[in-house]
Each structure stands twice: as structure tokens, then as C-alpha cells.
Regions:
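Non-catalytic interaction-recognition regions
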Residues: 1-102, 109-112, 116-562
């Protein structure tokens, strides 16, 4: 089941249009792509196409007349039960009931591959996400980034793309020096030295604790080094420790990366200098005001690439974050040959989007090969009370603390209950509440209820794997559940192509609700109705498989018992 029903219907509408034109029922015109969507109101079929509303001016005919001609010439298909023209010119399609119920067997046959598609055609997509500065523990903002990126990677893989997950370690910027100075101060203080804490240093107990641990493990060896050398060494040691902690936290969130790419590699390999030279040769680099600038007609203002010592009042030139972005784009799209590079960034980086795309274009690359997702902030709440956080001040809740309090499943699910471009609240109390108000509990409970139902059937002597006559599935709640199950491939396609993984949580909640309605309306195990029971057990198994598949794509466990 790797082909979307929606696409097959669009093809039928297109063929109907072509046949009508050949028979001169419609004039010749060039049609835009046929759009097929799900009607908002029940009773308007399973699918609808508004294409005729777009064709009126081209055909010089009313949309309804165009729709009638297309509907009359659409070829028959086993999955189409009824075609009708409605309203001002919609073509409504109702799926054939026999074909619909037969899909229960197809879903069970597909098994864990149900929902997989081939729309990616094996193209190489890289998703780079989290990539938090290695100067402190991950917070809930980083957790949202992590959940968005990992779920998107799951969806892209299911859609048929070859996917690589990457974490970009920012270990070449000025923040690394500030980090090293902060650690040095706390390290020296733990050894009894009166060392002032840097004005722009990183606050927080974790810096104090790191300094103490390094003092315990290494004694005063860093005090014997020249201060600059000690700061540099402690900065590297601090980054190593933070990255180890980040890896542990992300593993607890069931996230693993294929690659950990260090920013410093861009400079040590000479790639930054080479990319800068390419831009210079093409006329995109100018030098003024003691700095090196990138200039491009698509940008409202030039972007600084390198600041000189006179500007930053430090002993060496200092590349900006944007400088690294230039070389990094070349590394991804050319040296490693990804067809598309997807970045997951916080919305505070919105100003960098145009610069990165302009730099890619200036290097001779198609900027459309770069996709940048911008996600909004998360407000951490406990009921109605907001929990404040600030990495610099040290007053923040870490991802580790969040994991310890609510666990990985509520984090992964609830951080995807809003679109990425919407600011969202994460309620710590709701995340642990065992009620229908908690969306992850509601969905997981549906899976556990199905599993319990199947165990009960086995206890009653039923072979739940036995085939049944699915044509007996005629109750509206049964048919509604089949229809909802068959939406999964479309949700995968929509989420993957629009880079919108939140559709998956919406679908999971909807599927759970439709199953609960089926469970309420239809007695599954009825000894006096053996054939009906076998058919409903098949549908129940298909629902469990689909719910488990959805939760797996979300990176959330599908419990057998709750």
C-alpha cells in the first residue's frame, strides 16, 4: 500500500478531463495539477476535487458544467463507489464499500510497513537538529527542537527518503572562550583561589559543579599552565562533558544521531577559507569598517563574515556564526552530496534564513535545496503557574529534570501537539495526569485497551489471527474506523512534504477517538455471532497495528497494558 488513494483519484479526474476534451465535451486548455481533498462536512463523499472552480475561466464554462462533463467521463475504478457533482462545481467521490472493508486485510498484510510510501524516491535528505551550544544542559526549548527533528526524520524515512540525522556542535565560536573562562573561575575557586568570575560568564550550579569535579580529578594542574592555555583546555574539556550529558539525555528521549559534526572541522579542514575564496572570486565579498562582509542583492543589508581585532578588541580575527553557515552549507550539499539539507532552528534565528539561502545561491547551489524550519518558544507551566528559565542566569529547568518528572513519552507527544510556528505551553501537571485530558495518555490507553480486548478474546478461545469475512463490517462506526485507518499514509505524506510533524499527533488523537466510538457501538467478541466476531477482530487488529505504527513514528511507546 505505497500509493495514496488521493493520488489515484486525482489521476482519475485528470483522465476524465482528457477524455471529455477528446470527445469535445470540453475545450482544449492546460489544466493545473488536480487537487483532491477530504470534505469538511460528512455526506459530501470521502474525497472531493475543487479543480473545476479553477477551470471556469480557461474553459469559458460554468464550474458545475465542467464538473458534470468530467464526472461523466471518469473511468471506472474498483475503489470508487459513487461520483457526484455538488455545489458550484465540486466533484465528490465516495469509496466503494466492498473495496473499503477489503483494505482491512491489506493493512494487516502490510504489517509494520503500513504507512510507508515511495514519494521520496530514495533522495538523500539530512535533518540537522538540536545543535544547542555545548555550554550548558539541554532545556525544554532544545527538547522541542529534538522532538520536531527526530519525528520529521522518521516521517521522511517512512515516505521513502534516505535520511541522516546530524547534530552540529558549535565548538568554534566566542562562546567557547567565555565557557572556558567560566569553568576556569569555578575550578580555581574550588581550589581556594580568589579568582573573579568573568562579567559575561555562564552562571548556574552546573558550572560550579563542573569546576569542582575537574579539581577533584586533575588537582591544580591547570593552575600551573599559562592562563590562556588553561582556559582553552578547560573550554574543550567542558564541551566534552556537556556533549556527553547531551547524548545521555537524548538517548533517554530515544533519539540517536548518525553524525556529530563539529564546527571546528570547517576551519581545520580549510573549507571555510575555500568557500570564502569562492565568494570573493564571484564578487560577493567586500572589506570595509575593519570587517569582511558578504553582500548579495537578495539581502536588505550586508552580513558580517569576519570581524577584525579592531572591532572585537581581541587578539585574533573572529569568524561569525554566519561564516560557519556558509562553509557548512557547502559541506552538506557538495562534499556530502545531500539532495536537501533541513535545519531545525529556533524562531530567534529567523534573520539568518535569507542569509544562508543567499550564500548557497552565491556558491552556485540551488537555495531550494535548503529548508529551514523555525519553531517557537515553549512556556513551561505547572497548572496556571509559569516556570521561568534562563540558561545564562542558571535559573532553568533542564531536559534531564523534565525527563525525571514526566518521562520521555509525554515530552515527545505533547511537544508536537502544536504546529512548529506556534508558541506552546507545556503543562507539567497535565503531562502526568492519567485522564482523557492528557493526550498521550488518551492515545496510549486506546492501544492498551485494544491489546486488552484481544487478550480477552484469546482467553475466550478465539483465534484472533484467523481470517474473517470483512464484508460483514457494515456498521457506520466500523466503516468510520476503516476510513480513519486508511488516512495514515496521507498523514505521512502531508507531514513529510510540508515538514509538519504535528499532523501525526492530531491523527493519533483522532484515530484513538474513532476507535473508542467503535468500541462503544460494536460488541467485538460475541460468541453467538462467530463470523461477525472474526471480522471485528480483524478490524481491531488493524486498528492496533495502525495506532502502534503512528506511535512508533512519534517515538512514543505503544503499551500493551496500562
Amino acid at each position: 500500500m505505497t500509493e495514496l488513494i488521493r493520488d489515484r483519484i486525482a489521476e482519475l479526474v485528470g483522465v476524465g478531463m482528457q477524455i471529455a476534451q477528446r470527445k469535445e465535451a470540453l475545450p482544449e486548455f492546460e489544466s493545473p495539477p488536480v487537487v483532491v481533498e477530504r470534505p469538511r462536512q460528512s455526506g459530501h463523499g470521502d474525497y472531493a476535487s475543487p479543480i473545476c472552480l479553477q477551470l471556469a475561466s480557461k474553459a469559458q464554462m460554468s464550474p458545475r458544467v465542467i464538473a458534470e462533463h468530467i464526472a461523466a467521463h471518469m473511468p471506472a475504478a474498483p475503489f470508487v463507489g459513487h461520483v457526484e457533482v455538488a455545489g458550484p462545481g465540486y466533484i465528490n467521490i465516495t469509496l466503494d464499500r466492498s473495496w473499503l472493508t477489503a483494505q482491512v486485510e491489506a493493512v494487516l498484510e502490510a504489517g509494520e510497513s503500513f504507512g510507508n510510501l515511495k514519494i521520496g524516491h530514495g533522495q538523500k535528505h539530512q535533518v540537522e537538529f538540536v545543535s544547542a551550544n555545548p555550554t550548558g544542559p539541554l532545556t525544554i526549548g532544545s527538547a522541542r527542537n529534538a522532538v520536531i527533528g527526530d519525528t520529521l526524520a522518521n516521517l521522511l524515512a517512512a515516505a521513502g527518503f534516505e535520511v541522516e540525522r546530524e547534530y552540529y556542535v558549535n565548538d568554534a565560536g566566542s562562546q567557547v572562550r567565555h565557557f572556558g573562562e567560566s569553568i576556569y573561575a569555578r575550578y580555581a575557586q574550588s581550589l581556594g583561589q580568589e579568582t573573579p568570575f568573568p562579567e559575561n560568564g555562564y552562571q548556574g550550579h552546573y558550572i560550579v559543579e563542573m569546576g569542582r569535579q575537574i579539581a577533584q580529578q586533575h588537582g591544580d594542574q591547570y593552575l600551573d599552565l599559562p592562563r590562556e592555555s588553561a582556559v582553552r583546555s578547560l573550554g574543550k574539556e567542558g564541551i566534552r562533558r556537556i556533549i556527553d550529558e547531551v547524548q545521555r539525555d537524548l538517548t533517554a528521549l530515544d533519539i540517536e544521531f548518525d553524525t556529530w559534526f563539529h564546527e571546528s572541522n570547517l576551519y581545520e579542514s580549510g573549507l571555510f577559507e575555500r568557500s570564502l575564496q569562492m565568494l570573493r572570486e564571484k564578487g560577493y565579498i567586500v572589506e570595509r569598517e575593519d570587517a569582511i562582509w558578504f553582500t548579495h542583492p537578495d539581502l536588505e543589508a550586508d552580513a558580517v563574515v569576519i570581524r577584525s581585532p579592531q572591532v572585537i578588541q581581541e587578539p585574533s580575527e573572529r569568524p561569525t556564526y554566519f561564516a560557519s553557515d556558509i562553509a557548512y552549507a557547502w559541506n552538506k550539499l557538495v562534499e556530502r552530496g545531500f539532495d536537501k539539507a533541513i535545519y531545525v532552528w529556533g524562531a530567534d534565528h529567523h534573520g539568518d534564513v535569507a542569509r544562508v539561502k543567499a550564500a548557497a545561491q552565491a556558491l552556485g547551489l540551488d537555495p531550494e535545496r535548503i529548508e529551514i524550519m523555525l519553531y517557537q518558544l515553549v512556556n513551561l507551566k505547572r497548572g496556571e503557574e509559569e516556570v521561568r528559565m534562563s540558561k545564562r542566569a542558571g535559573d532553568f529547568v533542564t531536559l534531564r529534570e523534565l525527563l525525571d518528572e514526566v518521562g520521555p513519552d509525554p515530552i515527545r507527544f505533547m511537544l508536537l501537539t502544536s504546529s512548529v510556528d506556534a508558541t506552546m505551553d507545556f503543562d507539567l501537571d497535565l503531562a502526568t495526569e492519567q485522564s482523557d485530558k492528557n493526550p498521550v495518555y488518551y492515545v496510549q490507553y486506546a492501544h492498551a485497551r485494544i491489546s486488552s480486548l484481544l487478550r480477552h478474546a484469546i482467553d475466550q478461545g478465539w483465534d484472533v489471527e484467523a481470517p474473517g469475512d470483512v464484508s460483514l463490517l457494515t456498521h457506520e462506526s466500523e466503516l468510520a474506523l476503516v476510513r480513519k485507518i486508511l488516512e495514515l499514509p496521507e498523514v505521512v505524506a502531508l507531514s513529510a512534504t510540508q515538514l509538519a510533524p504535528h499532523h501525526l499527533t492530531f491523527y493519533a488523537k483522532s484515530l484513538a477517538a474513532v476507535f473508542h466510538s467503535f468500541y462503544r457501538d460494536c460488541r467485538v467478541v460475541a460468541p453467538e455471532e462467530a463470523e461477525q466476531t472474526r471480522a471485528r477482530l480483524m478490524l481491531t487488529r488493524a486498528a492496533r497495528l495502525t495506532l502502534a505504527r503512528t506511535l512508533t513514528l512519534l517515538g512514543v511507546k505503544a503499551p500493551e497494558r496500562m
